[in-house]
């Protein structure tokens, strides 16, 4: 253990994160707002008295005070709240409090992020394309073709409130704030959760607060896991650790908590010897890929299960971690179906006397668009029926023609932009056809005309509007090839965040 003293010491600055006084400091909220830490939450700083319409610092203060006054929170046997202050607005007040807690608890972390960004500004400027979600796919194309086994891991969530609070103890050394957080979670947990949903970390009404709790849990888990991986591998990891989603992408995990108490670390390190292990996390899941035998993958599998069970008190069955051969498994990853296929390459060898062909088999990562889930999403958004036949949108007939066309064109281009890396473009053309014809039917319904007559009157103008972005880009880069259909894959390096619609049947892309 003497070899790694730096890994098991907390940053001394973290020992002075006293957050409790910040709850009642209006200047702290203004500071957070000025630093851009609370975007799209400007209403939190408006001191209005209309509780049903505005978030305000005054409301947060009052609610925190009443949380400590236990006589105001007496609940009768039938579950109704006796105090008229809470009444039927208890869910609203819990949301307001969660917003206030999220702002405050992010302050010490976010200020360190800003200072880290200033130190690493030059390095970030050299590699701006790493911000893109699509940047992971070229990496997978280069690496997965040389690997044999893949383990798909579903990261378990801490189902007990105390686990989330205890995880924060390693990062926030303020007992008063943690005590207040514990009271808040126990008082309002029923407001957040529903009987049908046991995992409520990503409820839309409280996503910011619970996203912070979830990321703190994942950060500690990955700190331990990546430390073991780096020390057991022949090659040190060069990846950056992620704490806040899309905020701390470039921040290295420099400080780890002490977790190997009473464990012979050298034995653990010698237990996992893999020269080529890769780790990717996305949407509450992670991927482990290796070139070695399934025995090593099983070792990592049971190590993760024991780590979650004994360190985080989170029960995870080994069956939640699947080990598959890359050549026989299709991975549903970030809106794509990805699998490794053997592609034959024929080379003709000519000698002085003979000529013969050499057939070389090469592994290649194929990415395709999941057409059925996309059609299902379009059907639920009323762009087509269950069979994929386009229908009109009656809710849009009150808008102007330009607004209707702009909406459909924006949706089409968003889909084309993200799914441009598909190996098979035919399914993507079908999605474009559904959106284009749905737009025409909506306009024809508005003008009380037939689709044929409306298309004849409109001409080719609508087709030019639906010209996708990759078509414009290719026309500039490859002017000679722009006339014929381009079937290659395009990965855009300007997608900094992933929208909810990727992997979600009822995504926000259809409502924007």
From Swiss-Prot:
Gene Ontology MF: a single term: RNA binding
Subcellular location: Plastid, Chloroplast
InterPro entries in UniProt: Domain_X, Maturase_MatK, Maturase_MatK_N
GO cellular component, one term: chloroplast
Residue runs in coiled coils: none
Keywords: Chloroplast, mRNA processing, Plastid, RNA-binding, tRNA processing
GO BP terms in the entry: mRNA processing; RNA splicing; tRNA processing
Similarity field: Belongs to the intron maturase 2 family. MatK subfamily.
Function in brief: Usually encoded in the trnK tRNA gene intron. Probably assists in splicing its own and other chloroplast group II introns.
Protein's recorded name: Maturase K
Native source organism of the sequence: Oenothera argillicola
């Amino acid at each position: 253990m003497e070899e790694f003293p730096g890994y098991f010491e907390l940053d001394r600055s973290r020992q002075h994160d006293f957050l409790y006084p910040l709850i009642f400091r209006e200047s702290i909220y203004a500071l957070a707002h000025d630093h851009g830490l609370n975007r799209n939450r400007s209403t939190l700083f408006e001191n209005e008295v209309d509780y049903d319409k505005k978030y305000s610092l005054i409301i947060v203060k009052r609610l925190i005070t009443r949380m400590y006054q236990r006589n105001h929170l007496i609940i009768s046997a039938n579950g109704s709240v006796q105090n008229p202050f809470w009444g039927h607005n208890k869910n609203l007040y819990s949301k307001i409090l969660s917003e206030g807690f999220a702002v405050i608890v992010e302050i010490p972390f976010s200020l360190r992020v800003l200072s880290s960004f200033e130190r690493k500004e030059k390095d970030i400027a050299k590699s701006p394309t790493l911000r893109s979600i699509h940047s992971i796919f070229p990496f997978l194309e280069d690496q997965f073709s040389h690997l044999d086994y893949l383990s798909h891991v579903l990261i378990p969530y801490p189902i007990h409130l105390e686990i989330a609070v205890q995880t924060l103890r390693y990062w926030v050394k303020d007992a008063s704030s943690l005590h207040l957080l514990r009271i808040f979670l126990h008082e309002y947990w029923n407001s957040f959760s529903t009987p049908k949903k046991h995992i409520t970390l990503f409820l839309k009404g409280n996503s910011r607060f619970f996203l912070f709790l979830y990321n703190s849990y994942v950060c500690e888990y990955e700190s331990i896991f990546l430390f073991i991986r780096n020390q057991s591998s022949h090659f040190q990891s060069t990846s950056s650790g992620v704490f806040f989603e899309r905020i701390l992408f470039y921040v290295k995990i420099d400080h780890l908590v002490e977790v190997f108490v009473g464990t012979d670390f050298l034995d653990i390190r010698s237990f996992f010897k893999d020269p080529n292990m890769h780790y990717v996390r996305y949407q509450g899941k992670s991927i482990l890929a290796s070139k070695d035998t399934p025995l090593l993958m099983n070792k990592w599998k049971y190590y993760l299960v024991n780590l979650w069970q004994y360190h985080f008190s989170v029960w995870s069955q080994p069956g939640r971690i699947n080990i598959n051969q890359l050549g026989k498994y299709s991975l549903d990853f970030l809106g794509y179906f990805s699998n490794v296929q053997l592609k034959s390459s024929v080379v003709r060898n000519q000698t002085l006397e003979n000529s013969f062909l050499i057939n070389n088999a090469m592994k290649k990562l194929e990415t395709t668009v999941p057409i059925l889930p996309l059609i299902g999403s379009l059907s639920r958004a009323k762009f087509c029926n269950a069979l994929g036949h386009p229908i009109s949108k009656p809710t849009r007939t009150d808008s102007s023609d330009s607004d209707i066309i702009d909406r459909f064109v924006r949706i089409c281009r968003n889909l084309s932009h993200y799914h441009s890396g598909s190996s098979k473009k035919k399914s993507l053309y079908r999605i474009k056809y559904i959106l284009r014809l749905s737009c025409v039917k909506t306009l024809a319904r508005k003008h009380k005309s037939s689709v044929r007559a409306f298309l004849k009157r409109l001409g080719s103008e609508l087709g030019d509007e639906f010209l996708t972005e990759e078509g414009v880009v290719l026309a500039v880069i490859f002017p000679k090839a722009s006339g014929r259909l381009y079937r290659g894959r395009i990965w855009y390096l300007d997608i900094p965040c992933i929208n909810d619609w990727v992997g979600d049947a009822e995504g926000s892309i259809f409502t924007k």
